[in-house]
């Protein structure tokens, strides 16, 4: 397993981690299998989405802010919206590996989704296969 450290600089942001996932795949030597990317935090997640236009991640964050506003929640730490956003994006993704490459679509990238930053974070990449 590969463990990556990440520092986020905003309260909410999507960080493109595709290069780190590709790096883990290269180091693993796996040609055919699956790459699992996992976030061990309850206020951050992992997703796959467009990486060609940075406005897409800005739009996604804007929509998440609209549908999950900062209101009074029972959870008193003040980060309930971050927990709910993580529920929507998820904590992991699985990406097929074919001929030593991530089987991502032409415009796809892997993102670490920060909803309660800035913070020091980690994410894990596990490559399985042959």
Language model: regions and residue ranges:
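Active-site histidine-anchored catalytic micro-motif
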Residues: 1-130
């Amino acid at each position: 397993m590969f463990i990556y450290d990440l520092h986020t600089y905003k309260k909410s942001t999507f960080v493109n981690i595709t290069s780190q996932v590709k790096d883990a795949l290269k180091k693993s030597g796996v040609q055919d299998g699956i790459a699992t990317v996992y976030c061990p935090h309850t206020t951050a997640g992992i997703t796959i989405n467009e990486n060609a236009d940075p406005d897409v991640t800005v739009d996604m964050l804007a929509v998440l802010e609209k549908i999950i506003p900062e209101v009074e929640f029972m959870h008193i730490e003040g980060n309930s919206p971050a927990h709910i956003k993580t529920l929507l994006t998820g904590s992991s993704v699985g990406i097929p590996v074919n001929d030593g490459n991530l089987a991502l679509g032409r415009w796809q990238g892997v993102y670490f989704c920060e909803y309660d930053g800035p913070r020091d974070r980690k994410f894990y990449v596990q490559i399985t296969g042959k």
